[in-house]
């Protein structure tokens, strides 16, 4: 049962947060901690293959004890993926919507979906109570202090009465067109060069597979531009980053 929310946001009484997950343990723990006081039910969806099609073991329950604080609020889901590298990504993203239904949201309840490292904040709640919108997130790349010059349209949400009828992959595809409010963080390609190489070998877009991540970290750059060291780390980010 979802707990009732006292003095909720707009007309919604509960909030369901959905994310894709590959193997980003630290990112998932950061997400759950950052959103703990805002979310009633978390939905975490893992595929049986990387987006590039390599078989992978189910990992979500391997370190279950580390997530005991949220065990009564997490819907862990495993989905079997097929097709090409982009179709596998689409299938996993659409699966979030199907799994969100297991939380039984009401028409006015807020439902959000993201990649695991896209973490929104409470500034979105009033907007999401009324309409579908995207969080414009402060984007940090390679290290939590290194900021990209443009923010990232990441987490998408809205009232379930609107989200239920949408194709979530199509919403993701047109996220640059959605109403946007600055909110939260997108911390991507974290954890060092080895973690970056593992991610590059797994994601749908193959263009990062030959990137020299050691060189990028040494020169404080991303592939297409320099990164600015802004001297602050978002609250609660893992020390390993």
Report the location of each language-model feature.
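Short acidic, S/G/P-rich loop/turn micro-motifs used as interaction or catalytic elements
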Residues: 22-25, 50-51, 117-120
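N-proximal low-complexity "stem/linker" segments adjacent to membrane-targeting elements
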Residues: 1-37
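Acidic donor-binding segment of Leloir-type glycosyltransferases
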Residues: 36-88
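Short, glycine/charged-enriched secondary-structure capping and boundary segments
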Residues: 31-33, 56-59, 126-129
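Short loop/turn motifs at secondary-structure junctions
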Residues: 38, 106-107
């Amino acid at each position: 049962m979802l707990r009732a929310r006292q003095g909720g946001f707009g007309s919604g009484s509960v909030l369901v947060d959905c994310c894709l997950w590959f193997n980003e343990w630290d990112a998932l723990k950061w997400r759950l901690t950052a959103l703990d006081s805002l979310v009633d039910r978390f939905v975490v969806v893992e595929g049986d293959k990387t987006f590039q099609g390599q078989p992978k073991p189910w990992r979500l329950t391997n370190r279950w004890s580390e997530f005991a604080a949220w065990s009564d609020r997490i819907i862990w889901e495993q989905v079997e993926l097929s097709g090409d590298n982009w179709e596998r990504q689409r299938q996993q993203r659409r699966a979030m919507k199907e799994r969100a239904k297991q939380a039984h949201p009401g028409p006015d309840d807020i439902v959000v979906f993201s990649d695991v490292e896209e973490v929104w904040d409470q500034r979105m709640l009033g907007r999401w109570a009324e309409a579908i919108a995207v969080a414009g997130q402060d984007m940090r790349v390679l290290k939590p202090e290194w900021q990209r010059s443009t923010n990232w349209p990441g987490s998408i949400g809205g009232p379930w009465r609107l989200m239920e009828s949408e194709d979530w992959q199509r919403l993701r595809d047109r996220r640059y067109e959605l109403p946007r409010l600055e909110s939260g963080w997108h911390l991507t390609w974290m954890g060092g060069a080895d973690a970056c190489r593992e991610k590059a070998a797994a994601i749908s877009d193959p263009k990062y597979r030959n990137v020299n991540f050691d060189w990028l970290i040494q020169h404080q750059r991303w592939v297409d531009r320099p990164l600015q060291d802004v001297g602050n780390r978002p609250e609660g980010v893992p020390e390993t980053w």
